[in-house]
Amino acid sequence: LTGRTNVGKTWIGEYFATMAWNMGYKILMYSGEMSTAMVGFRFDTLNKHFSNMGLLNGSGTLGKKPDTDGAKYLQEDYEKYITQLQQKSGFIVVTPDDFEGRKPNVDEIKSLAIKHGADMIVIDQLSLMSDKRRADIPRIAYNNISEDLFLMSKELKKPVLLMAQANREAVKNRKKGESPELHDL
């Protein structure tokens, strides 16, 4: 998934991961920007429709309950949900903190995918991964990482969903009504 800044790439990627997890698939998600708590709040919003703003702000009301006449989710509903959620596993989130504060390379993600038996790997995002071949030019590094992810996907026979942020040039082009191009990564 490629898009400009703040257009919802992570939301879309995590939505796909959450839906796959609900179908019984094991997910490995690398989040290069957000903490596990932030990813978790988004998961709770996508999985059970809790208000993301309510979770972030510590609000007493956490959104409308689906299939009701306007009933609201409350803190005790969230606590009950968390207790039930602990009975199910298989959604692993890793961040740079899990790699001693640095960007992981594809081999490290692959090792975790094998270790946890992941059925789907989500990478958020390309620019927050490390190129094990250590290319100096970002475009070449991104090409190397993309190639390594493709080969990992092929070897493990598992889908990889990769988010990539378009650069500043893409933002300028947006003002002209143009879509991001591959060279805008």
Language-model features, listed with the residues they occupy:
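Phosphate-binding/switch region of NTP-binding enzymes
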Residues: 42, 73-76, 140-185
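Residues immediately C-terminal
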Residues: 128
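Residues at the beta-strand->loop junction immediately N-terminal to the Walker
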Residues: 2
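The conserved Walker
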Residues: 5
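Hydrophobic positions on the alpha1 helix immediately C-terminal to the Walker A/P-loop
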Residues: 12-16
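Cytosolic-facing regulatory segments adjacent to core modules
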Residues: 23-116, 131
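Conserved glycine(s) of the Walker
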Residues: 8
